[in-house]
Amino acid sequence: MSDYKNTLNLPETGFPMRGDLAKREPGMLQHWYEQDLYGIIRNAKQGKKSFILHDGPPYANGSIHIGHSVNKILKDIIIKSKGLSGYDSPYIPGWDCHGLPIELKVEQLIGKPGEKYSAAEFREQCRAYAAEQVAGQKADFIRLGVLGDWEHPYLTMDYGTEANIIRALARIVDNGHLMKGAKPVHWCPDCGSSLAEAEVEYYDKVSPSIDVRFAAVDKAQVLAKFGVSEAKGDVNVVIWTTTPWTLPANRAVALHPELEYQLVQVEGECLILAADLVESVMKRAGIDYWQVLGSCKGEALELLHFCHPFMNFDVPIIMGDHVTLDAGTGAVHTAPGHGPDDYVVGQKYGLEIANPVGSNGCYLPGTHPVLDGLFVFKANDIVIDLLKDSGALLHVEKLTHSYPCCWRHKSPIIFRATPQWFISMDRQGLRSQSLAEIDRIERQGLDEQNLSGWIPAWGKARIESMVANRPDWCISRQRTWGVPMAMLVHKETQELHPRTTELMEMVAKRVEQAGIQAWWDLDIRDLLGDEADQYEKVPDTLDVWFDSGSTSYSVVDARPEFNGHSPDMYLEGSDQHRGWFMSSLMISVAMKGKAPYRQVLTHGFTVDGQGRKMSKSVGNVVSPQQVMNKLGGDILRLWVASTDYTSEMAVSDEILKRSADAYRRIRNTARFLLANLNGFDPCKDMVKPEDMVVLDRWAVGCAKQAQDEIIAAYENYDFHEVVQRLMQFCSVEMGSFYLDIIKDRQYTAKADSVARRSCQTALYHIAEALVRWMAPILSFTADEVWGYLPGDRAQFVFTEEWYQGLFGLDAAEQMNDAFWAELLKVRGEVNRVIEQARNDKKVGGSLEAAITLYADEALATQLDSLQDELRFVLITSAARVQPLVQATADAVASELAGLKVGLGKADGSKCPRCWHYSTAIGQDAAHPQLCPRCVTNVAGQGEERKFA
């Protein structure tokens, strides 16, 4: 017999070498859908301890972008890893469906409500548009490999959810947190509505920067406060502002009570300025000569009166801690209707909350003859002319500064006092309770798993400062497409009906049946009878942040699959500290006195490879749809997992290419395992641990160590650590050591020998573990691998838990982990010498080499213990150990202390079956071409292996 190929155990598997993910994944998704994979998982996990990750609803408008993909993939990785850790972790995806962006889209399509279509018809169109957007986004999320109840997502426009949002507000009313007031709120003239904090973005804007004189009503009284009896000209307190248009609403000038102010004589007048800012004011006003006449603390000037620069009234000096020396003059123009700080200090002094600006951003009639009807930003120059005419303008220049803008229109917004409904931060202690909950979440996390409840830990300080400093929450909106506030107020007093919470429940029951339109269709006589004549509906809708912020109640508490469990985790982008995390915290504490979550995980924004924000104009946008169509969902998932999400997440074609390279290494490892498990039946062929070759037990132990570290990384949400450990296992421990060494034994040993079955047993255990490590991240590939693994098993890897069949070497054994770690280093040194010899054309491959290891006594003892099997570890045809002192001159010194490596050509000729060189080829007449080892493997009992 001259062709021995048929006697080899060559690797064989149907598992393809190429992932071809973009083509293969859609078919897998179809299979998952047809089999009801999500339902199978839920049944398998029934009765397990629960872990609830509550989905923050994306807005139902437009296609998903790379940031959406990051968010959904991170959630999916956590849900799947929790399943492997023995949790029942249902995932109900959701969408935010009401609000202005959808209104604006529908307006573009059919016009404003009340024009061609009634408000009721307009709402129906909004509902239909939102449903269409949900369908498009849902298809993309499913394509990412995200498992969830996609057949039954939650939508904030579901009738039941709309009703529960009203019930949430009723509970907050009942708990005494709601109040009405004319407070200044962010107002977008383009939207014609107030905006939430989270709907405000900041962009650079050029504004006029002006210093304005307010002249003292009683000059002598003011001079006396500075200890001055006389001075030349008027006495003027100087304010600085970048919003001249707000001056018609000025009702005071604020000073800091503790700051020192100076009375400064300049040509023809005296100016009152903060002492530390005198020089900077003089410099910008171009005043070269001045004299300080006197000084006093701000508090000395309290309630002195000064003339408004162009309106026919005077205003008081008031004290405010918000006054700083960061810029300006130390005196702050105060318009309580146009600024939160101004409003707060104005309340203290009982100032009028003047709001001369309409909802369209134009001055109301009766403001001022030259200003009435003008758009405020166009009025700045006219106000400056008024100041010039009255002699009140000290200085004007242009200033580029960061200015609040509407997130939708990107246009500058204003603060505008309008009658609105607010959740009070302090009336019932909501602020202090919320801050206490923020603390508790951190402590509870540290107590339970030594991991802060705020992940990363800096998230705590961020939300803490936001809650500590935030104003009362304006929850009312003047929109058409939104959940109604569903309250009734007395026509004369504007007080809420005394049975408000009871009436809101009656409305909620109607909304549950017919949606929010039921409120607008409702005749309040049906609720109040004869009393109806005294009451009217509150026409406002709720801020959409109230919709999404109340979902722990309106969705999680309501859905049966959550079994009454409250959410364990909220996970969103870092912008949500002031968005969903905050609104959810406020509502839950206002309703129940506790936070809605136990952990809050935040991820960074996506940027391009150079760290730049993605923008269509720059042309650096990475589309998740294109990535999936070109590379596949698993590559996108691997990029997400391998990137540290705690800061900005860089993505580009080059970065994704690196992810594809890493994917190939993992896939190749999985394929090698499957190909070499060909013909292995775990029921019949498994070798007991005590009978296995030592190296095989070491490999299983490596997998056990890797698994412990991988599970810990999953539990700490360190997914990039999972990927790094997975890569180290596949590339280093397996790829460049174990899998390399076992090829000879796996291919050439007798098919059913212990030597080969021991190796296959190790590969089987490793494959069972590896497929589970992969599953949360490389979900498509793990499912594919699962289908090729030998033995009876559940239909899907996603119903399983971490593999429990791993074991390792005993530390007391001679050939323990430390022994093999040392051998890894020795092999590395030998490989270096062989590589050099190949470059020098001394040998063609490692099997042409005979290696002599010159070792010190301790190392020699270790190496000798492998006996003749040392050569299999080194993958050479011969290997011997000699004392270090006998090292020849050509032996290569190594980086290992006590080792030199000698290399020569292997004696004998090459065996055509195993490719090892042997001097004993031809000793068996029946197989004259084979070495003795191959003869016993082909025709005898098969070789024995103990160590390698």
From Swiss-Prot:
Keywords for this protein = Aminoacyl-tRNA synthetase, ATP-binding, Cytoplasm, Ligase, Metal-binding, Nucleotide-binding, Protein biosynthesis, Zinc
- Gene Ontology BP terms: isoleucyl-tRNA aminoacylation
- Record EC number: 6.1.1.5
> Which residues hold ATP?
K616
Motif 'HIGH' region: chain residues: 58-68
Task: Give the note describing cofactor binding and stoichiometry.
Answer: Binds 1 zinc ion per subunit.
Major localization class: cytoplasm
List residues binding Zn(2+): C911, C914, C931, C934
Query: Cross-referenced Gene3D superfamilies, in alphabetical order?
Result: 1.10.730.20, HUPs, Valyl/Leucyl/Isoleucyl-tRNA synthetase, editing domain
Entry's family note: Belongs to the class-I aminoacyl-tRNA synthetase family. IleS type 1 subfamily.
Q: Which cofactor does it need?
A: Zn(2+)
Q: Where is this motif: 'KMSKS' region?
A: 613-617
**Reaction it catalyzes:** tRNA(Ile) + L-isoleucine + ATP = L-isoleucyl-tRNA(Ile) + AMP + diphosphate
**GO molecular function annotation:** aminoacyl-tRNA deacylase activity; ATP binding; isoleucine-tRNA ligase activity; tRNA binding; zinc ion binding
Q: Which PANTHER family match?
A: ISOLEUCINE--TRNA LIGASE, MITOCHONDRIAL (PTHR42765:SF1), SOLEUCYL-TRNA SYNTHETASE (PTHR42765)
- Cytoplasm among the record's keywords? yes
InterPro entries found in the cross-reference section: aa-tRNA-synth_I_CS, aa-tRNA-synth_Ia, Anticodon_Ile_BEm, Ile-tRNA-ligase, Ile-tRNA-ligase_type1, Ile-tRNA_ligase, M/V/L/I-tRNA-synth_anticd-bd, Rossmann-like_a/b/a_fold
Quaternary structure and interacting proteins, as annotated: Monomer.
Q: Which CDD domains match?
A: Anticodon_Ia_Ile_BEm, IleRS_core
Subcellular localization: Cytoplasm
**What is the protein's known function?**
Catalyzes the attachment of isoleucine to tRNA(Ile). As IleRS can inadvertently accommodate and process structurally similar amino acids such as valine, to avoid such errors it has two additional distinct tRNA(Ile)-dependent editing activities. One activity is designated as 'pretransfer' editing and involves the hydrolysis of activated Val-AMP. The other activity is designated 'posttransfer' editing and involves deacylation of mischarged Val-tRNA(Ile).
- Name of the molecule in the record: Isoleucine--tRNA ligase
Source organism: Edwardsiella ictaluri (strain 93-146)
Q: Does the keyword Aminoacyl-tRNA synthetase apply?
A: yes
What is stated about domains?
IleRS has two distinct active sites: one for aminoacylation and one for editing. The misactivated valine is translocated from the active site to the editing site, which sterically excludes the correctly activated isoleucine. The single editing site contains two valyl binding pockets, one specific for each substrate (Val-AMP or Val-tRNA(Ile)).
